[in-house]
Amino acid sequence: MRLCLFSGSSPGHLPIYAEAATRLGHVLADANIGLVYGGASVGLMGAAADAAQAHGGEVIGVIPRFLVEKEVAHNGLQDLRIVDSMHQRKALMAELSDGFIALPGGLGTLEELFEVWTWAQLGQHAKPCALLNINGFYDGLSTFLDHVVAEGFLKQAHRDMLIVENDVTTLLAAIENYQAPPVTKWIKREHT
């Protein structure tokens, strides 16, 4: 099994974020779960990759050429795949993975998470999508998503596809036990 990690290229302001990324890397390696991620040496993504690799885990980095040229590629990886674009990066990361976890991060992290979650909503895959809610980082997003449901722009069944947990072990158990709901036709002509 391999899990794709979306996370910040920054460590954030609080040490708890990097500590959680490091713990996630250790736990994945110890559970023999491969890590697929954005291929950089910096931020939370670099911390998770370093930890997984230090514990003997499989780590696959996928990075676009323009980021290699900016010298942020993790050159210490055993498997670093260089692609031509961000689109190719996301497609390959998804292809190589059996599920997705987002740690705290910025726009790129959110964009990556929302894209794979949308693919699940549309029935393009049945892989679990999850948030590791470190230090309540995603509390505001969870509240907003509940508001989106209440306002009729997201079905509760699709909201429920997103796993949100505060603890690495609990999160991995939820991912392991995830059963994708049947995707029914969600667009009705009268609503378009």
Where are these regions (language model features)?
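Gly/Ser-rich helix-loop-strand patches that form or flank binding pockets
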Residues: 79, 121-124
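Active-site/ligand-binding-proximal alpha/beta "capping" segment
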Residues: 88-122, 130, 182-187
